[in-house]
């Protein structure tokens, strides 16, 4: 005689970014109930934004979250040049048989996760209005993935130091698939 006891866990995730969606999908795959709270934003999604991802992370994402192989652009060769010496090549990474890493468009993985989550009976999107402690008492775990959330501002804002003294260059690369 075997009795199977199933613990029903309910998780609250704050924020609707790529991290929160991937986490929600991984939990839903384990049949854990997830409510994802989001704030309505009037920002446009940058369709040219890409993410670099290593082979081991691709394998993990495919196994635990969702298959992203069709979205990937493999990178087998990387060359780094310097502006100071007439565009002289200073570093070169190359691997003929394996990919160094891959890139994918942020918007594509974001949209795929939303579509898959909406199909699950274990997942709900909920609009975040105002923090009330009583709204969160029914959850076994609350995960905050949104640095702009009022809970973060209330309890952790003095803990973060921000120094954005960096420069980033971006480009759109045409290549054969």
Q: How should these model regions be labeled?
A:
Residues 9-19:
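Beta1/beta-strand and adjacent pyrophosphate-binding region of the FAD-binding site
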């Amino acid at each position: 005689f075997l009795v199977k006891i199933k613990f029903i866990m309910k998780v609250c995730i704050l924020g609707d970014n790529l991290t929160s969606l991937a986490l929600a999908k991984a939990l839903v795959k384990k049949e854990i109930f997830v409510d994802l709270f989001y704030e309505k934003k009037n920002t446009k999604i940058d369709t040219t934004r890409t993410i670099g991802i290593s082979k081991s992370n691709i394998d993990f994402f495919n196994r635990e979250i969702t298959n992203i192989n069709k979205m990937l652009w493999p990178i087998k060769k990387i060359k780094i040049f310097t502006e100071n010496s007439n565009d002289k090549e200073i570093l070169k990474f190359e691997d003929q048989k394996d990919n160094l890493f891959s890139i994918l468009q942020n918007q594509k993985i974001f949209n795929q996760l939303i579509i898959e989550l909406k199909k699950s009976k274990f997942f709900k999107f909920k609009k975040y209005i105002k923090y009330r402690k009583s709204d969160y008492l029914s959850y076994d775990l609350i995960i905050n993935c949104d640095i702009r959330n009022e809970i973060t501002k209330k309890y952790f804002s003095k803990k973060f130091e921000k120094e954005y003294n960096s420069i980033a260059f971006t480009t759109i690369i045409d290549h054969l698939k």
